[in-house]
């Protein structure tokens, strides 16, 4: 999902093709048709490491009643703390490069989340 003129659009073909579909409505319809969870990747924030797209995540959490997993944008531990504090309806945060390149240790992330009162398995 990516922002286009102030709204969220569904993109296809690796983010190269705008389908013209409203992203929030499309996700709601997917859940209405049986999707059991949503892994929401923001094309705008993916790989940038400036934090998750909190506005998009909140918009999705407001319209679905299944687990929502945030993807795209994590650049450090502080982004996860911000995510879980700002969007209580989000169930998980996903990241890759910060772990692959050794920028963040999973244990350190879990301990910081725990210190901030965020439920995490240690």
Where are these regions (language model features)?
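Short secondary-structure boundary segments
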Residues: 1, 42-43, 72-73, 96-98
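Conserved anion-binding
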Residues: 1-40, 44-45
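Active-site-adjacent beta->alpha loops and helix N-cap segments on the catalytic face
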Residues: 2-5, 46-61, 76-80, 102-112
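Structural preference for beta-strand elements that scaffold enzyme active sites
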Residues: 9, 37-39, 67-69, 91-94
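Conserved phosphate-coordination/catalytic loops
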Residues: 17-21, 51, 74
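Short phosphate-binding/catalytic loops that engage adenosine nucleotides
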Residues: 35-36, 65, 118
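C-terminal helical cap(s) of enzyme catalytic domains, especially alpha/beta-barrels
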Residues: 81-122
């Amino acid at each position: 999902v990516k922002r286009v003129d102030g709204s969220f659009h569904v993109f296809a073909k690796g983010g190269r093709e705008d389908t013209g579909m409203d992203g929030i409505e499309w996700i709601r319809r997917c859940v209405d048709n049986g999707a059991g969870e949503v892994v929401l990747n923001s094309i705008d924030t993916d790989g940038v490491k400036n934090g998750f797209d909190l506005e998009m995540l909140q918009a999705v959490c407001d319209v679905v009643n299944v687990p929502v997993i945030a993807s795209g944008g994590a650049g450090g531990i502080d982004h996860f703390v911000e995510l879980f504090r700002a969007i209580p309806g989000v169930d998980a945060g996903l990241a890759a490069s910060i772990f692959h390149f050794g920028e963040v240790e999973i244990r350190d992330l879990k301990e910081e989340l725990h210190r901030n009162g965020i439920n995490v398995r240690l």
